[in-house]
Structure formats: structure tokens, C-alpha cells
């Protein structure tokens, strides 16, 4: 397959940096377009798929507000993802369709909408171009990229243009983790990518178009897909290097450190431990009423690169183990450039299995461990863990499929990995 074409007038060259920041400011795609007086988006009725992260870096103004105020483009509709356009909803929820009070623009609820439903919304709105501008966090189970995926299928079938206003991947450009297999696709993984894809939304859109759209949609967007690149960004950077304001992409993603750990520690959603929801440090605080100080001691003896574990006690106010005192750990990140979040979580899970007979899977799934399997993309990880495999064995099992993915994605990358 050939990668989807990006208009070179829209894609300034990235900085080939050392991962430590630089003198030239990192400029997201939205700001690139705004600096061009919105010209690349003029002449078409726009449907903007965004949320509170879709801001202009210089003013922190939401792009829909800025577009409407400018009068230079025709914003016909907004399509809100999980948590909603203005970000008022918790995990697993969205904002119902409504008219935005500030701009007067019709807002559609796109969360969980399949391509057929999105096609209907696009037709009702009378749009010619879908514009996607949402800060992703680089993990397969973060739902925004799957809303984009479904919207791309709908755009292919409807003959619409699709523009991604690109933003940095806050955890960098390395691919990590296992590939999903067909029988484990779901709303937290609809198609074939690895657990931490190491791509920006724009790169992922190109990958989706070239690798997945022919089967999923019957055709490609091709030259109807454009990516407006981030200026001066390198995949060697972490988010702190960008100088950009961190706007929480979702209520439980409060800091860039949360994002660094999330591709691994989100796996605890599938267990009987709290993943820190209902605390101020979700995905950093992990624990359960049965956990004691042995877990932190065990983990620190492992000398896992980039992280340290502090024994912690907390009481979640909602979600699993709500209103119960939980023992556990807080994951600290002394070296963010060295962190492999999926290895970190694997070591944590192996330690739990070795130390606590009470360790188990989330209740309420169709079979014990189903939720965990959907997050990892197959039953293999869970079965290895249950069989007592070491972390090295579990991680080693997916290295070939990861290498295959990284080879396939190469043609779609927009920012040098060298």
C-alpha cells in the first residue's frame, strides 16, 4: 500500500532534535493553520472533531471558538469524542447532541458511533471536510484514535476530505507492546496496531488509510487525506520538552507523567486492583485492600529502568475499591526518557501474582480476565501471567509482531526517528 498523500505546503519539516527541547518553538498543526489565516481550511463546510485539547498554543483558545471568531472558515458542525467537546463527561460517557452556547454551532455526539452513524451525522451536517484536532496519548486503548478511525471510514464512503491538525505524541515515537488479534477487537482497539503505537494522530491516520482503510472501508482517502504537521517536534521528545501547555485529554489524564505510564498501568483496569481512578493520581497510584509493603520492596529490587516505587496508601472516591483503604504503590519517574511503561506494568503484574493469592481479574466480565485480554489484544499475556511466566518471557513473546508493525508503519511516518 502507498501512504496517504500529505500536501507539502501544509507540512513544514520537523526539527531533528536530541529529545531535550530546542530554541525553535514546537508549533501544533492548529497553530500552523491559524498563522496562515485558516487558508488551508477555507472553501469547504467543516465538521470539526475536537475536545478541550484542541487549542491554539499561543492563546489557549479552543480552535472552534477561534475559527468561528475569525470568520474565515465555515464551521458547520462539531463532533465530540468520549468526554465530550467541552470535556464535561467522565470515562465511558460523552456529551449529548446540542447547540454550543458560545458559538451557536451544532454539536454531535460521536463517541462510540460506528461509521454508518457517522455517515448519517456528516450528511445531516452537510459538511465537505472532517477536521480532526485532539491530543492523543499514544496508547491503543485510548478511544480518540478509534473515533478518528470510524470517522475516516465514514469519510471514505461519503467522499469527504479529511484533515488532521497534528499534535505531538506526548510519550515519544517508540512502538511498544503486543499486537491486537481479530477476536479481541473492541472499542478500545478496533484494528491492527500495537499497544503503544509511537505515532502522532496524523501519522496514525496515514497508517490507517494505507494499511486498514482498503479492508475496513473498501477504499482509501488517498489525496483527500491531509496532515498539517507539527513544526519543530522530534519523536525523541517527551511532552515536557515541547514547551506546550498540558491540557488533560480526559479527566483521568491530569499530567504528562500520567500519559507516560498509561500504556502500561491502564492494564490494571482489567484486574481487581484500583488503577487510581477516584484519586488525584490515576494510573500512578495502583493498589488494593490486600496489598502491603512487600510489593514496593519487590519492585524496587527489580531495578526497573526509569522508575521507582513508593509504598502508598489511598482511598478511591469512586470506581474499583471505592471508599476502601488500599495499599499499593505510587510509580515515580526519575528518568522519563528511559521509561518503558508496558515493561513496568508487566513487572508489577508478575510481582502481584508472586506475592498475593488474592490477586485476580475484574469482576463482571464475560469470563475472568476478558477485560484484561481486550486491553492487551489477546489472551496470551494473561495466560502467561497465570502460568507464572517471568516478565522477560511475557515481553519477549511480542517482539516479532512489534518489529513487523514498526516495519509497516515506516512508510507513513512524518517525523524522523533517527
Predicted features by range, described:
Residues 74-83, 165:
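Short internal beta-strands
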Residues 91-127, 139:
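Glycine-rich oxoanion-binding loops at beta->alpha junctions
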Residues 232-316:
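Glycine-rich, aromatic-lined ligand/substrate-binding cores of catalytic
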Residues 86-91, 163-185:
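Glycine-rich, charge-decorated loop segments at or immediately adjacent to ligand/cofactor-binding or catalytic sites
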Residues 136-148:
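Glycine/threonine-rich flexible loop motifs
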Residues 184-262:
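Conserved anion/nucleotide-ligand pocket segment
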Residues 287-396:
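Conserved functional hotspot residues or short segments at active or partner-binding sites
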Residues 25-73:
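N-terminal phosphate-binding or glycine-rich loops at protein starts, especially the Walker A/P-loop
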Amino acid at each position: 500500500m502507498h501512504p496517504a498523500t500529505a500536501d507539502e505546503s501544509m507540512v513544514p519539516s520537523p526539527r531533528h532534535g536530541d529529545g531535550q527541547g530546542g530554541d525553535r518553538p514546537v508549533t501544533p498543526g492548529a497553530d500552523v493553520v491559524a498563522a496562515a489565516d485558516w487558508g488551508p481550511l477555507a472553501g469547504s463546510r467543516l465538521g470539526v472533531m475536537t475536545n478541550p485539547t484542541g487549542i491554539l498554543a499561543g492563546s489557549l483558545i479552543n480552535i472552534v471558538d477561534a475559527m468561528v471568531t475569525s470568520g474565515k472558515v465555515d464551521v458547520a458542525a462539531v463532533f465530540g469524542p468520549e468526554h465530550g467537546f467541552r470535556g464535561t463527561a467522565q470515562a465511558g460517557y460523552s456529551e449529548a447532541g446540542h447547540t454550543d452556547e458560545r458559538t451557536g454551532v451544532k454539536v454531535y455526539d460521536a463517541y462510540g458511533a460506528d461509521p454508518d452513524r457517522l455517515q448519517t451525522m456528516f450528511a445531516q451536517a452537510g459538511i465537505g471536510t472532517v477536521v480532526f484536532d485532539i491530543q492523543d496519548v499514544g496508547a491503543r486503548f485510548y478511544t480518540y484514535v478509534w473515533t478518528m478511525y470510524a470517522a475516516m471510514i465514514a469519510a471514505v464512503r461519503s467522499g469527504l476530505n479529511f484533515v488532521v491538525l497534528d499534535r505531538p505524541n506526548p510519550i515519544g515515537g517508540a512502538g511498544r507492546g503486543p499486537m491486537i488479534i481479530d477476536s479481541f477487537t473492541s472499542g478500545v482497539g478496533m484494528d491492527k496496531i500495537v499497544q503503544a503505537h509511537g505515532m502522532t494522530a496524523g501519522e496514525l491516520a496515514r497508517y490507517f488509510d494505507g494499511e486498514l482503510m482498503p479492508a475496513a472501508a473498501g477504499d482509501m482517502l488517498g489525496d483527500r487525506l491531509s496532515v498539517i504537521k507539527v513544526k519543530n517536534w522530534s519523536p525523541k521528545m517527551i511532552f515536557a520538552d515541547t514547551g506546550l501547555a498540558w491540557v488533560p485529554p480526559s479527566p483521568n489524564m491530569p499530567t504528562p507523567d500520567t500519559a507516560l505510564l498509561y500504556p502500561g498501568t491502564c492494564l490494571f483496569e482489567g484486574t481487581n486492583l484500583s488503577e487510581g481512578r477516584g484519586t488525584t493520581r490515576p494510573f500512578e497510584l495502583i493498589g488494593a485492600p490486600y496489598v502491603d509493603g512487600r510489593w514496593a520492596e519487590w519492585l524496587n529490587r527489580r531495578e526497573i529502568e526509569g522508575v521507582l516505587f513508593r509504598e502508598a496508601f489511598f482511598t478511591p472516591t469512586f470506581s474499583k475499591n471505592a471508599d476502601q483503604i488500599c495499599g499499593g504503590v505510587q510509580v515515580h519517574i526519575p528518568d522519563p526518557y528511559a521509561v518503558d511503561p508496558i515493561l513496568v506494568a508487566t513487572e508489577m503484574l508478575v510481582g502481584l501474582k508472586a506475592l498475593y493469592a488474592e490477586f485476580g481479574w475484574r469482576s463482571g466480565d464475560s469470563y475472568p480476565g476478558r477485560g484484561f485480554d481486550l486491553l492487551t489484544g489477546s489472551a496470551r499475556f494473561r495466560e502467561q501471567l497465570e502460568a507464572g511466566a517471568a516478565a522477560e518471557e511475557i515481553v519477549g513473546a511480542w517482539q516479532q509482531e512489534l518489529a513487523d508493525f514498526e516495519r509497516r508503519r515506516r512508510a507513513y511516518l512524518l517525523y524522523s526517528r533517527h
